[in-house]
Amino acid sequence: MPRVKRGVTARARHKKVLALAKGFRGRRGNVFRIAKEAVMKAGQYAYRDRRTKKRVFRQLWIARINAASRSFGMTYSQFANGLKKAGIEIDRKVLSDMAIHDSAAFGAIVEQVKAKLAA
C-alpha cells in the first residue's frame, strides 16, 4: 500500500477555512486553529439567527400595524379580531407594508374592521 502524503488536502482545507474566516478580527482571521473555531461558531450563530429572524420580523410587523391602527383609534388586538370577523385574510407582512406605504388603503381596511366590530 503506497504512502499517502496529505499536504495538498491539508492546504485545501486550510484555505477553505481561512476563506470562510475572511474579515474576522485578529488571529481569528489568519491563524487556522483559531479560525476553525471561529468559523464553526459563526455557523452556529447563522443557524440560530436564521430562525430568530422570523420572530424578529413578525414582531416588527406587529409593532408597525399596532402603531398604524392606533392612529385610526384602535389597538392591534382589536384590529386583529376585527380582521378575523370581517374575513379579511391579509398577512401581517402585507398589512405592515400597507400601513407604511399606502395609508389610505390601510385606512379603508380599518373602516371595514370597525364596521364589522360595531355590527
Curated annotation (Swiss-Prot):
Entry keyword set: Ribonucleoprotein, Ribosomal protein, RNA-binding, rRNA-binding
Entry GO terms, CC: ribonucleoprotein complex; ribosome
Pfam families membership: Ribosomal_L20
Annotated CDD domains: Ribosomal_L20
Domain of life the protein comes from: Bacteria
Gene Ontology biological-process entries: ribosomal large subunit assembly; translation
Signal peptide feature range: none
PROSITE patterns reported in the protein's UniProt record: RIBOSOMAL_L20 (PS00937)
InterPro entries registered for this protein in UniProt: Ribosomal_bL20, RIBOSOMAL_L20_CS, Ribosomal_protein_bL20_C
A GO term for molecular function: structural constituent of ribosome
NCBIfam families in the cross-refs: rplT_bact (TIGR01032)
Family of the protein in this entry: Belongs to the bacterial ribosomal protein bL20 family.
Annotated function: Binds directly to 23S ribosomal RNA and is necessary for the in vitro assembly process of the 50S ribosomal subunit. It is not involved in the protein synthesizing functions of that subunit.
Alphabetical list of HAMAP family matching this protein: Ribosomal_bL20
Protein name listed in UniProt: Large ribosomal subunit protein bL20
Organism, scientific name: Polaromonas sp. (strain JS666 / ATCC BAA-500)
Lineage start: Bacteria, Pseudomonadati, Pseudomonadota, Betaproteobacteria, Burkholderiales
Encoding gene, per UniProt annotation: rplT
